[in-house]
């Protein structure tokens, strides 16, 4: 009788403990989940719905169907310029940042003197205030008094009228922003590559060296293939951040001169918050940006599976 009573009580105790553990787990998850719903999911759904409407924040929301999207791809020249500039920025920053960060990681992965010091120096631009480094960058690349143009003029004989105008020039503004972004971010991705290099198998390099492979052959055929997961992560992160670029444009060029450095996110900001607000139209641009990033990411994932 006693053993039967114990057996009947045991499942209840297990059930109560399981329920209590589940409640504890949900209590930890709930704050983050609620925050995600309130600050991410609900605004995203509202933005999708708003993309098919006209709304200035003061009058009633008016449903207009696909008119916002039709206007984007037919008559809005600024949007088309912003889309082109965003793609150019991504194409310029992703391979340059990738190559520079990988090169620095390989160099600073060696047993050299002051290695930790140089790692810190390389990482510093990433953690430095964007406002401060942008001000310094504008001073260095000042068309009139910047040291870069002074060096070009005095040591390389470039005439004053032929000196590049950098951020102030329509043809050089995007190049200036791309160079700034590469310099600002390559330290962060260098650290990621350093972590990837620490996971590479040194025995493979030693075996290849015994077979007569030089340093370049070892890097290209042994080290680089082992870094494929790291490289894939870096490319994804650089691509997404490239499509979302805003801060650099705002601090260095303000989207100019003209629309030379106007990007999609900067244009979204202007449409939504500058002059007369057009929240529906800005939401439509956001949806185009979302779909563009999603398509590029899917293509990259499929390409990565093919490589594997």
Where are these regions (language model features)?
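Short, Lys/Arg-rich, polar N-terminal cytosolic tail immediately upstream
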Residues: 1-19
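A structural signal for multi-pass alpha-helical bundles of membrane permease subunits
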Residues: 18-308
């Amino acid at each position: 009788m006693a053993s039967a009573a114990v057996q009947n009580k045991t499942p209840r105790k297990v059930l109560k403990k399981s329920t209590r553990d589940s409640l504890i787990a949900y209590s930890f998850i709930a704050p983050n989940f609620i925050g995600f719903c309130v600050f991410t999911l609900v605004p995203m759904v509202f933005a999708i719905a708003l993309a098919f409407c006209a709304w200035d924040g003061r009058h009633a929301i008016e449903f207009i169907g696909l008119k916002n999207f039709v206007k984007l791809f037919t008559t809005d020249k600024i949007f088309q310029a912003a889309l082109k500039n965003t793609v150019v920025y991504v194409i310029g920053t992703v391979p340059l940042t990738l190559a520079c960060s990988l090169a620095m990681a390989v160099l600073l992965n060696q047993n050299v003197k002051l290695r930790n010091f140089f790692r810190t120096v390389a990482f510093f631009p990433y953690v430095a205030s964007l406002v401060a480094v942008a001000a310094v960058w504008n001073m260095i690349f000042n068309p009139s008094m910047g040291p870069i143009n002074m060096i070009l003029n005095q040591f390389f004989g470039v005439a004053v009228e032929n000196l590049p105008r950098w951020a102030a020039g329509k043809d050089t503004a995007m190049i200036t922003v791309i160079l700034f972004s590469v310099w600002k971010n390559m330290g962060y991705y260098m650290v990621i590559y350093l972590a990837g290099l620490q996971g590479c198998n040194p025995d493979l390099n030693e075996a290849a060296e015994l077979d007569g492979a030089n340093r370049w052959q070892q890097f290209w055929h042994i080290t680089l293939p082992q870094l494929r997961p790291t490289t894939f992560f870096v490319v994804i992160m650089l691509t997404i951040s490239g499509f979302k670029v805003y801060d650099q444009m705002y601090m260095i060029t303000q989207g100019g001169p003209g629309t030379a450095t106007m990007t999609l996110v900067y244009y979204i900001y202007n449409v939504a918050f500058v002059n007369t607000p057009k929240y529906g139209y800005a939401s439509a641009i956001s949806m185009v940006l979302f779909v563009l990033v999603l398509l590029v990411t899917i293509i990259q994932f499929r390409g990565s599976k093919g490589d594997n």
